[in-house]
């Protein structure tokens, strides 16, 4: 019976041919790049795979584009920076942090950055991060204040 069915290699070759013919990969990367570089407001989200429906709902008032990779626990959002952007981001970040996730502000207009910390709250390992930074940069000359917690 097994001899009568196509081999796994043959099935994979056919699948590969179908995917290439559909140009799905090009569309995937085009969408990914559009979201990662589009608009003055860009955020990176980390969440449990089951949490992306809520993330989508929390960030929808921003009116931008989203791309979620739930199996990776990673997502990106971008778009305009409407007036309530800082409060929407703060609410979304609070919900994510309570569930073990995070929201990092990758780009935003100055008025949004002034109202929300780009990195969010320092992690529990912050003391260790501080000691490592102090060991490698005792004079604090390398990018001072540009990382989480002002590192």
Q: What function would you assign to each model-found segment?
A:
Residues 19-151:
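Conserved glycine-rich FAD pyrophosphate-binding loop
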Residues 1-23:
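A conserved active-site cap/scaffold subdomain adjacent to cofactor or substrate pockets
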């Amino acid at each position: 019976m097994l001899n009568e069915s196509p081999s796994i290699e043959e099935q994979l070759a056919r699948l590969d041919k179908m995917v290439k013919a559909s140009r799905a990969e090009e569309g995937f990367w085009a969408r990914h790049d559009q979201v990662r570089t589009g608009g003055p407001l860009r955020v990176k989200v980390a969440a449990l795979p089951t949490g992306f429906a809520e993330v989508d709902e929390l960030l929808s008032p921003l009116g931008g584009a989203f791309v979620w990779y739930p199996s990776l626990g990673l997502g990106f959002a971008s778009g305009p920076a409407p007036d309530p952007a800082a409060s929407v981001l703060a609410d979304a970040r609070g919900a994510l942090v309570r569930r073990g996730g995070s929201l990092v502000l990758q780009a935003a207009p100055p008025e949004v950055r002034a109202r929300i910390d780009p990195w969010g709250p320092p992690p529990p390992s912050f003391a260790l991060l501080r000691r490592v930074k102090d060991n490698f940069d005792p004079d604090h000359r390398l990018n001072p204040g540009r990382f989480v917690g002002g590192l």
